[in-house]
Amino acid sequence: MKNVVNLRSYANVSLIPTLVLLDLQQEYVASPRLFSIPDADEALQNCRLALTHARRIGLPVAFLRMIDRAPYFNPALSYSNWIPGFEPMTSEMVFERSKPSCYANREFAYAMSEGGGHFVLAGFSGEAGCLATAVEAFHRGHQVTYLADASASLRLNQIAASTVHQTVAELICLYGEVTTTRSWIAEQSASVSCVGG
């Protein structure tokens, strides 16, 4: 009789990331609304790749969304709903917040701390939610990996959205790792094959 040993039970928990998808809400794709990101298609495609990969290999997934009692991100309006194709599964975490950082939700902060403090961040908007979350993760001693091509930023006054987003990625480099979706997937796939997944 052969003994089967689950190598995952011996894995360093801090090396297993949670995929955090931030604000994949209709507000960001509902043109001509104020928070609509015109060139969100590539970011959404890469978010979809990351989500499919995380689900396929069994990584934890967390969805966060902005909720506010205002004309934007109002739960009474359909714009606060998930973008079709990005609805959380019942086995996935869902958190709501009213401030830019994901850590504005205490349950998120607790889940990340208790889950090893390593997460992969993608979604909207880079210049607010993603940047604020990366900075706060650094201050809490958590490890964040930002999928820059699975995120998008809004323009700021006369600064083009693409310039803002490039700057956000450079700033997040100060607080964590910045990579592409395909590079992250390749790295995760290699890690899983080493563990025997």
Predicted regions and their residues:
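Active-site loop signature of alpha/beta-hydrolase-fold enzymes
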Residues: E27, R69, S153
